[in-house]
């Protein structure tokens, strides 16, 4: 069975977006995203696709698969494959993952395809255990942004909540998104050029850490 991952960036409050965009500028996160996903199919919703500047889409070195209710069957458009549902996207990702790619696979090549947004696509993918060809999302890569007290960043889109395992390696009760453990976490760093943008337009200092989680 193919292995499916999800990747996103979030504040410590779980914010991943505001007004159809990301309330930050994070060059380190963009570089990490490229490193992780390069060479693998990426699955996204229409709004995520449209949030990329036209000069950056399709994302190079990756099969771009866009989910949109505006199509009833798969069709090629603007350098991407447009499909009507998450299930259709996963079948397309399976087919693409089994074909040679021009780009060099990322260091996390154990993941065959990535979910990259937006909120509703993450929510459906993380909560399901019957995803065609993949079963369920098994890996999450997330960039965690720390907001200094008094500089909290607000937004209208949140990341899926992931329940972390206790010291015994299990989770109490049940969670719709399953039980997870952190397998790697980088030290906190202060971004030299990046910033978190509050609703007033003020640029606030950005501290970030990269985390990898695996489903138990």
Identify the role of each PLM range.
Residues 1-216:
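Enzymes that bind and transform nitrogen-containing heteroaromatic metabolites
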